Amino acid sequence: MRLILLGAPGAGKGTQAKFICEKFGIPQISTGDMLRAAVKAGTPLGVEAKKVMDAGGLVSDDIIIGLVKDRLKQDDCKSGYLFDGFPRTIPQAEAMKDAGVAIDYVLEIDVPFDAIIERMSGRRVHVASGRTYHLKYNPPKTEGVDDETGEPLIQRDDDKEETVKKRLDVYSQQTRPLVDYYSAWAANGDPAAKVAPPKYRKILGVGNVDEITARVFEALK
């Protein structure tokens, strides 16, 4: 099972990625983790990437694709792999296709933006313990304070409505076009591609976690 998970920030990709990886016995591949590991190990690509990052630059797609190809040669990828948060752009998707990286499924978790804003902006956190609440779905017994300690809850900057809206804007401009790219490739094929087109599946990411997980596994049959 080789797949790419797509969806907006806050759509619940991380939760579903964990369930998919457990069910199919495959690793979750994160470009951030790969970069850190390559830099730490001092591989040729890691050294190159470190130079760019130390200079405050963005690591090129060529380096990222090189890291991906190296990562997929490792033993734990023999049964498949799951990409979460990659590719982010059409050029990265094209580079993956040109590099012959095979994908069986592209799964989009679709959640309306207003639901994501409500889901994320309603979160409140007790910093010391990491306990998380939600104003609507899991409120504290007393407004604004942690159930166990009575200490104040905070809203993380990442969860503030204006920040969530900005992240969704970036997603719409950069990553949302991947949905059209992969659905078109799945529907029409590409004779020039080195790999077969993936199957494209879209599921609704609204409801409780068990319902969404059931939809995910049904889509991957």
From Swiss-Prot:
Binding site for AMP: 31, 36, 57-59, 85-88, 92, 156, 167
Catalytic EC class: transferase
Pathway where it operates: Purine metabolism; AMP biosynthesis via salvage pathway; AMP from ADP: step 1/1
Region annotated NMP, chain positions: 30-59
Main location, first listed in the record: cytoplasm
Region (Disordered): 138-159
Cell compartments where the protein resides: Cytoplasm
Catalytic reaction(s) noted: AMP + ATP = 2 ADP
Domain of life: Bacteria
Annotated EC: 2.7.4.3
Any single Gene Ontology cellular-component annotation: cytoplasm
One biological process term in Gene Ontology: AMP salvage
PROSITE patterns xrefs: ADENYLATE_KINASE
Stretches the record annotates as LID: 122-159
UniProt keyword annotations, A-Z: ATP-binding, Cytoplasm, Kinase, Nucleotide biosynthesis, Nucleotide-binding, Transferase
Molecular function in Gene Ontology: adenylate kinase activity; ATP binding
Binding site for ATP: 10-15, 123, 132-133, 207
Subunit structure: Monomer.
Alphabetized HAMAP family for the sequence: Adenylate_kinase_Adk
Similarity comment: Belongs to the adenylate kinase family.
Domain comment in the entry: Consists of three domains, a large central CORE domain and two small peripheral domains, NMPbind and LID, which undergo movements during catalysis. The LID domain closes over the site of phosphoryl transfer upon ATP binding. Assembling and dissambling the active center during each catalytic cycle provides an effective means to prevent ATP hydrolysis.
Function: Catalyzes the reversible transfer of the terminal phosphate group between ATP and AMP. Plays an important role in cellular energy homeostasis and in adenine nucleotide metabolism.
Protein name: Adenylate kinase
Organism: Cupriavidus taiwanensis (strain DSM 17343 / BCRC 17206 / CCUG 44338 / CIP 107171 / LMG 19424 / R1) (Ralstonia taiwanensis (strain LMG 19424))
Source species taxonomy: Bacteria, Pseudomonadati, Pseudomonadota, Betaproteobacteria, Burkholderiales
